[in-house]
């Protein structure tokens, strides 16, 4: 979300993203080293436990964090001791700037793993790019191996696509 100040757009996170970093700690002094970042809310499935089949008013992409804002957030997080990053959504593979985000996260001092949670529908299409980006690992959300049940749960026909992507990912590892 961006706000207008003096005819310029700013993020509500600007103060935080421009401040100096100290370790993230809870009230007991435990340091957090893990960041889970939802990159979007859009999804190419309509799982019955997650969202309605239709009538969803997603935020416009201009109201989501831009790649530049995500880069600053990732940098600040790494400066605060975050070493593990998990990128989620919605469906993060729908985000066109996903690969540069993964590459940037991998270049940060102290970050030693970047993982992605996906429903796997687009995995075959983007697997080579994900491998080249330096992605550390994948978590594929898959509720069933039965095609009929998959179609009922997700309200989409796509189990074969997911399994093909999963097989390609296993073969390439």
What is each PLM-predicted segment?
Residues 71-86, 95-173:
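Radical SAM/AdoMet-radical enzyme domain recognition
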Residues 5-113:
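Conserved alpha-helical substructure of the radical SAM core
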